[in-house]
Swiss-Prot record:
Presence of keyword Nucleotide-binding: no
UniProt biased composition (Basic and acidic residues): 23-36
Compositional bias annotation for Low complexity: 463-472
Gene that encodes it: YY1AP1
Tissues/organs with expression: Ubiquitous. Detected in small intestine, skeletal muscle, lung, pancreas, brain, stomach, spleen, colon and heart. Detected at very low levels in healthy liver. Highly expressed in most liver carcinomas.
Biased composition regions of type Polar residues, renumbered to the chain: 473-485, 765-774
Keyword hit for Transcription: yes
Function of the protein: Associates with the INO80 chromatin remodeling complex, which is responsible for transcriptional regulation, DNA repair, and replication. Enhances transcription activation by YY1. Plays a role in cell cycle regulation.
Cystine pairs: none
Annotated protein name in UniProt: YY1-associated protein 1
Length: 796
């Protein structure tokens, strides 16, 4: 040890004798020039390699331990990940000083130091690799422990219960039908070729998935059935091939024809026939009703009902969903699922669009229930069935004539043939005798279907004249128009609304000649006796058959239109009228023909007015009432129109005359008649209305006719009342017979004050009308112009 210390000390001293140890001249294999030996020996760097070599040879254990300590310290401070990157750098750092060593060429101990450093580097590298392996293994163990329970849960979610499997089977069958329908419809439109090809690819992919699934599970379970292959998939693929091969549809552009905006795009006839007769389309509810059109993309976002029922919509933005929900929650929006959920916070039970069909139940739509078919198939069903019947009869006849029916002994082959026959029972191409109605028939009266039904209270009461009281006189010539006018009066309906107070409008009624009727002095007939002011009076227009023409000038007749009634004639189309009131129809008929008219109140020669009593009741009151002198019982038949029943006793002072007048009323009352026929006293008719609940307005009404001879010009006809729960309207074809000698001539004139008044005709006019013969009445009646202000005139 002392020698080594002395040698190390001498190495540090340049003047020491040991600096040249071993002497250069004693080195083996030294070929160095003696002149250069001094310079090499004098260099101070020659002592460092010697020291390192000595340390490396004798203290290898200490060096290894030192390197391990350094490595551990460095690992704790910097981490092993950084050490991996620094490894190559250390190697370079070690190599660089090794190349810069200025050692004598005679020294060969330099290789020992290099080997030592390489060994230490390899040891450190192995330690790094061990540490790397330890950490990932620990992480993997933790991850495996976490993943184990998750794998079990995922395995559970992949199992379908029987209900889910059944539902998935139905959805796959519907999916195949929809893909096939879209392919057929898109093939007919050249602009939809991408859609046609994509649907065909989807069907082929389903077949590919089914084959791979069967190949995977068949070795473990030979009875395995995949849901990728529904019962109609093979038929759909075969139908697509046959359609592209045998069916040709003209897709060339036709001549441009002016089309309306709402023109219905009908199905192609050939496609409609395939849709109706193929078993692939096993759900009739999913059949299309129109063809497909290629439309350019629109900026407006549309939502379908199926999208409203979804929980997640990836194809819509949050803004679009917000606007959609807001629009569906508006008050004017129809009832929908979103509004229902907002109100009740519950999801409604959604109905099934299609009924479940099992594979052994599938058949073409034409064999399904009729209520499940679309409109075009319902309309075309009779034609299809008739053509199929003819085809079956023809095939049966051919089979009987040729005798080619063969019996197959193999049951399996018979079954295959029967199935094949059932599939090919309908031809692929449309037969010539089949007429398909593919366009919907528009409703002729679409508004009437939505019109509110009339309540039973407002139903009209039909009134017919009594057959025993028909006119006994018929002139020699009866025109052809009389047959139409003598139609059953049950079709002549008069609508009576609720009692209102119309404004009294004086106007000439079109189609009504001047008033001159034998057998009575005045005619006033409120159809429903509406409530009116005392000064207002309603005059009822007479029918043309009751109107006789006068030879003398007749004052202008002003007739108010009944505001509470409206006449309708059968088979006559009425044009809408802006003004309220009745509308008479123009018709030219001879005067002697007697037609039933509306209800007529025969009043003796006087001026009367209608006084409203309230509650829909009215009273006929003379302007100047006279005191009756002697009572006389006269049978009266009155027909008053009111929704409720009420007795109407009439008290009337009449002017006595040689011929007793005829008054129409609902019951027999005592009417006082004056004894002096010359004095024309005024009539007073008081109507006391006592409303009786729950009774018909015309119960117990029996018309009574005064026993007197019927006039050839005017026959007595009383109405026959039919009971109904609604308000009884007045029939237009009611007649009132007036005796020839007991009638007065009255006309309605307009006074200066703007009111109506009944004035008697001159005595000469009355006598001329009384003395007129039936033959003189067969002349043509001059019609009143439609202008309400034009004067009505007639000539006998």
């Amino acid at each position: 040890m002392e020698e080594e210390a002395s040698r190390s000390a001498a190495a540090t001293n340049p003047g020491s004798r040991l600096t040249r140890w071993p002497p250069p001249d004693k080195r083996e294999g030294s070929a160095v020039d003696p002149g250069k030996r001094r310079s090499l020996a004098a260099t101070p760097s020659s002592s460092l390699p010697c020291t390192l070599i000595a340390l490396g040879l004798r203290h290898e254990k200490e060096a290894n331990e030192l390197m391990e300590d350094l490595f551990e310290t460095f690992q704790d401070e910097m981490g092993f990940s950084n050490m991996e990157d620094d490894g190559p750098e250390e190697e370079e750092r070690v190599a660089e000083p090794q190349a810069n060593f200025n050692t004598p060429q005679a020294l060969r101990f330099e290789e020992l130091l290099a080997n030592l450093l390489n060994e230490q580097h390899q040891i450190a590298k192995e330690l790094f690799e061990q540490l790397k392996m330890k950490k990932p293994s620990a992480k993997q163990q933790k991850e495996v422990e976490k993943v184990k329970p998750q794998c079990k849960e995922v395995h559970q979610t992949l199992i379908l219960d029987p209900a889910q499997r059944k539902r998935l089977q139905q959805q796959m069958q519907q999916h195949v039908q929809l893909l096939t329908q879209i392919h057929l419809l898109a093939t007919c439109n050249p602009n939809l070729n991408p859609e046609a090809s994509s649907t065909r690819i989807c069907l082929k992919e389903l077949g590919t998935f089914a084959q791979s699934s069967i190949a995977l599970h068949h070795q473990y379970n030979p009875k395995f059935q995949t849901l990728f292959q529904p019962c109609n998939l093979m038929g759909a693929m075969q139908l697509i091939e046959d359609f592209s091969t045998h069916v040709s549809i003209d897709c060339s552009p036709h001549k441009t024809v002016k089309k309306t905006a709402n023109e219905f795009p009908c199905l192609p006839k050939q496609v409609a026939w395939i849709l109706a007769t193929s078993k692939v389309f096993m759900y009739p509810e999913l059949l299309p009703v129109c063809s497909l059109k290629a439309k350019n993309p629109q900026d407006k976002i549309l939502f379908t009902k199926a999208e409203d029922n979804k929980y997640l919509l990836t194809c819509k933005t949050a803004r679009q969903l917000t606007v959609r929900i807001k629009n569906l929650n508006m008050n004017r929006a129809p009832d929908n699922i979103i509004k229902f959920y907002k109100k009740t916070k519950q999801l409604p039970v959604l109905g099934k669009c299609c009924e479940e069909i099992q594979p052994h139940q599938w058949k073409p739509p034409i064999e399904r229930e009729e209520h499940r078919l679309p409109f075009w198939l319902k309309a075309s069903l009779p034609s299809i069935q008739e053509e199929l019947r003819h085809m079956a009869d023809g095939a049966r006849e051919v089979g009987n004539m040729t005798g080619t029916t063969e019996i197959n002994s193999d049951q399996g082959l018979e079954k295959d043939n029967s199935e094949l026959g059932s599939e090919t029972r309908y031809p692929l191409l449309l037969p010539k005798g089949v007429v398909l109605k593919l366009k919907p028939v528009a409703d002729r009266f679409p508004k009437k279907a939505w019109r509110q039904k009339r309540s039973s209270v407002l139903k009209p009461l039909l009134i017919q004249p009594s057959p025993s009281l028909q006119p006994s006189f018929n002139p020699g010539k009866t025109p052809a128009q009389s047959t139409h006018s003598e139609a059953p009066p049950s079709k002549m309906v008069l609508r009576i609304p609720h009692p209102i107070q119309p404004a009294t409008v004086l106007q000439t009624v079109p189609g009504v000649p001047p008033l001159g009727v034998s057998g009575g002095e005045s005619f006033e007939s409120p159809a429903a006796l509406p409530a009116m002011p005392p000064e207002a009076r309603t005059s009822f227009p007479l029918s043309e058959s009751q109107t006789l023409l006068s030879s003398a000038p007749v004052p202008k007749v002003m007739m108010p239109s009944p505001a509470s009634s409206m006449f309708r004639k059968p088979y006559v189309r009425r044009r809408p009228s802006k003004r309220r009131g009745a509308r008479a129809f123009r018709c030219i008929k001879p005067a002697p023909v007697i037609h039933p008219a509306s209800v007529i109140f025969t009043v003796p020669a006087t001026t009367v007015k209608i006084v409203s009593l309230g509650g829909g009741c009215n009273m006929i009151q003379p302007v100047n009432a006279a005191v009756a002198q002697s009572p006389q019982t006269i049978p009266i038949a009155t027909l008053l129109v009111n929704p409720t029943s009420f007795p109407c006793p009439l008290n009337q002072p009449l002017v006595a005359s040689s011929v007793s007048p005829l008054i129409v009323s609902g019951n027999s009352v005592n009417l006082p008649i004056p004894s002096t026929p010359e004095d024309k006293a005024h009539m007073n008719v008081d109507i006391a209305c006592a409303v009786a609940d729950g009774e018909n307005a015309f119960q117990g009404l029996e018309p009574k006719l005064e026993p007197q001879e019927l006039s050839p010009l005017s026959a007595t006809v009383f109405p026959k009342v039919e009971h109904s729960p609604g308000p009884p309207p007045v029939d237009k074809q009611c007649q009132e017979g007036l005796s020839e000698n007991s009638a007065y001539r009255w006309t309605v004139v307009k006074t200066e004050e703007g009111r109506q008044a009944l004035e008697p005709l001159p005595q000469g006019i009355q006598e001329s009308l009384n003395n007129s013969s039936p033959g003189d009445l067969e002349e043509v009646v001059k019609m009143e112009p439609e202008d309400a202000t034009e004067e009505i005139s007639g000539f006998l």
